[in-house]
């Protein structure tokens, strides 16, 4: 079973959510590449108490249900009081300062930051993809960021903790199921390599709600994978990773994170 570590950093709350995920694409090198986990947590300016072990249970339940080979153990957590870090702007000097100060462990160790995200449109979370030979800056920025209202007990319909599952999927090298072909005009997920996983049906664009029977790529096999954790549907609609996604996560974790 593959091993990694999670460090959860609790930093703030938000009251409105629009965007499901703000994870940015990885380098071309990672795109071309075809797990018991330990968890550490930090938190700042918490406005209410969350049962963070419940969230770790959510991760373990959903990763185990799909036989991914990953399991998460919370090994540390912190509550940080710092007004400058309550609202994090992605890809900002503020984010680098916060993560440089708080990040723990090795490149294989997942640091999870729970904080309000300042972005237009608002985001539920974002993550970093693994890189080959990561620089010190890339190592410092590595991890997953989610807002508190995406955790169990937050604001529906994204309040069952599956934003964290989705973003950890990115941290473990998974793309969106609707990953667009950059060489198409307009961009579409119906052509090109998609998410580089053979057993996820092609999907033209993100799905919202729970549109059963949606088929946005009618010339491709299968209906849209609306119940996959790497789509944008409601938490209650999401049920699984595929076997191919599990294989990709295990392979790239071992290749890019396991010994770093």
Regions found by a protein language model. Give the residues of each.
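Structural recognition of the beta-strand scaffold that forms the well-ordered cores
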Residues: 44, 53-54, 71-74, 109-114, ...
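Fungal secretory targeting signals
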Residues: 1-20
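Stable alpha-helical elements in mature extracytoplasmic
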Residues: 55, 94, 160-164, 242-248, ...
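The catalytic-center signature of Zn2+-dependent metalloproteases
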Residues: 152-239
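Residues that flank catalytic or metal-binding motifs in active/ligand-binding sites
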Residues: 68, 106-108, 140-142, 159, ...
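Propeptide-to-catalytic entry region of secreted or membrane-anchored zinc metalloproteases
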Residues: 18-110, 115-118, 254-259
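Active-site-proximal segment of zinc-dependent metalloprotease catalytic domains
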Residues: 100-179
């Amino acid at each position: 079973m593959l091993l990694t570590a999670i460090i959860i950093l609790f930093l703030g709350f938000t009251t409105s959510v629009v965007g499901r995920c703000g994870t940015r694409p990885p380098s071309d090198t990672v795109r071309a590449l075809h797990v018991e986990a330990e968890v550490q947590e930090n938190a700042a300016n918490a406005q209410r108490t969350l049962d963070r072990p419940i969230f770790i249970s959510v991760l373990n339940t959903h990763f185990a249900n799909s036989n991914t080979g990953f399991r998460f153990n919370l090994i540390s957590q912190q509550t940080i009081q710092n007004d400058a870090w309550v609202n994090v702007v992605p890809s900002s000097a503020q984010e680098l300062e916060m993560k440089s100060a708080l990040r723990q462990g090795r490149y294989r160790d997942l640091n999870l930051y729970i904080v309000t995200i300042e972005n237009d449109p608002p985001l539920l979370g974002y993550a970093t993809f693994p890189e080959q030979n990561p620089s010190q800056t890339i190592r410092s920025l590595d991890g997953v960021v989610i807002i508190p209202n995406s955790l169990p007990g937050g604001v529906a319909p994204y309040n069952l903790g599956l934003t964290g599952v989705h973003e950890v999927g990115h941290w473990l090298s998974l793309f969106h199921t609707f990953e667009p072909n950059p060489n198409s005009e307009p961009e579409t997920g119906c052509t090109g390599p998609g998410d580089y996983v053979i057993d996820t049906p092609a999907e033209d664009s993100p799905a919202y709600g729970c549109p059963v029977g949606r088929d946005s790529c009618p010339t491709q096999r299968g209906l849209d994978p609306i119940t996959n954790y790497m789509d944008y549907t409601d938490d209650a609609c999401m049920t699984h990773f595929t076997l191919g996604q599990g294989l990709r996560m295990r392979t790239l974790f071992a290749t890019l994170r396991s010994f770093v």
